[in-house]
Amino acid sequence: MSNGDIWVGTRKGGLYTFDANLQSKMTNQYFHSNIYAIAEDRQGRMWTGTRGNGLKVGDTWYYNTPSDPTSLSDNNVFAIYRDRKDRMWVGTFGGGLELAEPTSDGKYKFRHFFQQTFGMRMVRVIEEDENGMVWVGTSEGICIFHPDSLIADGDNYHLFSYTNGKFCSNEIKCIYRDTKGRMWIGTSGSGLNLCTPQDDYHSLKYEHYGTSEGLVNDVIQSILGDKKGNLWVATEYGISKFNPSTHSFENYFFSSYTLGNVY
C-alpha cells in the first residue's frame, strides 16, 4: 500500500496487515467469505473483493441487486485495479468487468463491460502494461483495451483467445508485468506465456513455456518476480523458478502429498 503496509487476505475470511518489516499490526479484520482481491484508491481507502459476498469500499458494502442495473453485476469479486487516472476497475467472476463511478452522495454505481459471452464474464485478473493498456484475464482469453477508449465505446477492445485462434488458451489465471515491462500470462492447462503485442495491439506474439520446456505443471495459479529477475511460478503441483535469460526452470516441492503442492 502507499504507506508501505502489506495487506494479506485469506480464503477463511481473514484480512491481516503487516508493516514493511513483516511485523503484524493490530488492524486485523474478519469477513464471512473468502477474500480474493485487495486494492487502495487515491483517498487511501481499502477496496476488498470477496467470493460470494460482494465488494467492500472503506466501510461500505456493495452487492448485486438484480432490480438495479447500476449495482455490482456479481457478488464474486476476484480482481480490483486502479488505473493511471485513479479510476477503479472491478473484475467479477460471473458478471464481467465493472467501472466504479462516484455518485453525488459519495458512493459508487457500476458500469458494466464484457457481457458478450459467458467466458468473458468470468474475470480473474487485471493488469496494466507500460503503454497504459489494460489487460484483463478471463475464461474467454485476454481482453486488452485503453481505458479511455473502452469508456467511450464498450466494444473497443482486443480479444485474444483459443476460440478465435489468437492465443493458446481461453482460461487465463494470472498476468504479471515484470521489471522490464514484459507481460507474462499464466493459464490453466497451457502453461506460461510471454506476450508481446504487435500491429498496434491487433495481434499478439507469444512464447510458450510448458512442461516439455521444464515447467513443473501447466496449471498456473500465480507469478511473481524476484530482485534477480527470476519468475516464481506457482502451479497446481509445485513451484517453478524460471530464469528468462537462460529459459531454464528449477522446480520445488514442499510435500510428499499432491494436495500439499497446490499453490
Would you name each region that the model predicts?
Residues M1-Y263:
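Carboxylate-rich, polar loop motifs that coordinate divalent cations or form catalytic acidic clusters
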